[in-house]
């Protein structure tokens, strides 16, 4: 899911 990409960004 996109959530993992967001978490990887921070």
From Swiss-Prot:
Tissue specificity comment: Expressed by the venom gland.
GO CC term (a single one): extracellular region
Keyword terms: Secreted, Toxin
Localization annotation: Secreted
Superkingdom of source: Eukaryota
GO terms of molecular function: toxin activity
Protein known as: Toxin To56
Organism: Tityus obscurus (Amazonian scorpion)
């Amino acid at each position: 899911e996109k959530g993992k990409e967001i978490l990887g960004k921070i």
